[in-house]
């Protein structure tokens, strides 16, 4: 499973990218807003993410019509070949996604909640589809099952699931075990990968033994 960082907060993102565990960052207008930014800051986020080692930077287009979404998507894609343009799974967004995909722009259909959305994403040529795991169902196990069904619906085709809005590392592990190829983690969840209590206890034991060596 490829892991991404669901943040536009520069400091934590760069620190986590430096671990080598994450392929890039995913953003949307809300994530930008939470970092004190706006959609106008997307190019700057792209620049520092790429400088920090991101192989892919997911930037979201927006608009009330397919023309608006597609045109803004083209501008985002022009930043570099590492950009993946995100669009929502609305009529306008899906239409724009199909246009961008036909032009060779890597795309992700976001705001997905059902296996039918996975079918839609493949139909419009999206490279990825992003289900919001925590919003699919109150029960995490049920939500994971739905995302696995989305993954299976796509089969071996060119569209892949990138699971988003995850609340636990258990869900990440379950999705990875089922073959889901990618997930994006918020900063607290990403940091939790490195702070399991048993891992920290083992590390402390190793450090004590090393310090006791003559």
Task: State what each model feature region is.
Residues 1-56, 62-70, 200:
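Conserved N-terminal beta1-alpha1 strand-loop-helix module at the mouth
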Residues 4-6, 34, 58-65, 82-91, ...:
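Catalytic beta/alpha-barrel core
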Residues 11-19, 68-72, 96, 114-124, ...:
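Catalytic cores of alpha/beta
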Residues 20-24, 79-82, 96-108, 123-130, ...:
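Glycine-enriched alpha-helix->loop->beta-strand junction motifs that scaffold or abut catalytic
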Residues 24, 29-34, 111, 127-138, ...:
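Glycine-rich phosphate-binding active-site loops on the catalytic face of alpha/beta enzymes
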Residues 28, 85, 121, 175, ...:
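Conserved, mostly hydrophobic/aromatic
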Residues 43-57, 78-80, 94-106, 142-161, ...:
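Alpha-helix-loop-beta-strand connector modules within alpha/beta enzyme cores
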Residues 154-214:
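C-terminal alpha-helical cap/extension of soluble enzyme domains
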